[in-house]
Design a protein with these regions (language model features):
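Residue-level hotspots at or immediately adjacent to binding/recognition sites across diverse folds
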Residues: 1-192
């Protein structure tokens, strides 16, 4: 049947000369860190689930799919923004002087506990021909205060959907004994 998943962009071999150096170095770069994809049963059609926020490539994941009366429902997550503090990290470090910008973005994303991007659980609706007909952001189990939203990335993700449309996943939320402690807990999404 129709399947979903995600992967990185293909890597390109590029020649890059760091500032202050005379000799070019070989680097491997890619356009985005991860992208969700839907693939038809016979493999002849593939649909990338590009995030609405795609600066530095953005991110998306497709975790589950179900057949519906009018097509398919796919759930996962996608990037929605970059917090100010993370953007400052990018501006300070990813200047295309020591390494290609995309390499720096990938390293920063890997080295920061919650990554560079704010990500939200999402539901995509596709028709029988795998055309995307709607994209619905499903929300998160907490509302970050202004300071938190500037400093940290927050994530929710939809992991599975059943035939009744119930969507389950995980979300950052506050620890009940201490509002300053952010945890990731299992959730279900109802009405976004």
């Amino acid at each position: 049947g129709v399947t979903v998943g995600w992967g990185s962009a293909p890597y390109d071999k590029v020649s890059f000369t760091p500032d202050g150096e005379d000799d070019a170095e070989t680097w491997f770069t890619h356009e985005f860190i991860e992208r969700g994809i839907v693939i038809s049963a016979d493999g002849s059609v593939s649909v990338e689930l590009e995030p609405e926020f795609n600066e530095y490539g953005g991110t998306s994941r497709a975790n589950d799919i179900i057949k519906t009366n009018s097509g398919y429902t796919v759930v996962g997550n996608m990037s929605t923004s970059i917090p100010d503090d993370r953007q400052d990290n990018i501006d300070d470090n990813c200047d295309n002087e020591d390494e290609p910008t995309s390499v720096c973005i990938n390293l920063l994303n890997s080295n920061i506990t919650r990554g560079l991007f704010n990500k939200r659980a999402v539901k995509w609706e596709l028709d029988e021909s795998l055309n995307i007909t709607s994209v619905e952001e499903l929300g998160m189990a907490l509302t970050p205060d202004e300071g938190e939203a500037e400093d940290d990335a927050f994530t929710s993700t939809a992991l599975a959907v059943n035939s009744n449309g119930t969507i389950v996943g995980s979300s950052n939320t506050r620890y009940y004994k201490n509002d300053d402690t952010i945890l990731t807990m299992p959730v279900y999404f109802k009405d976004g």
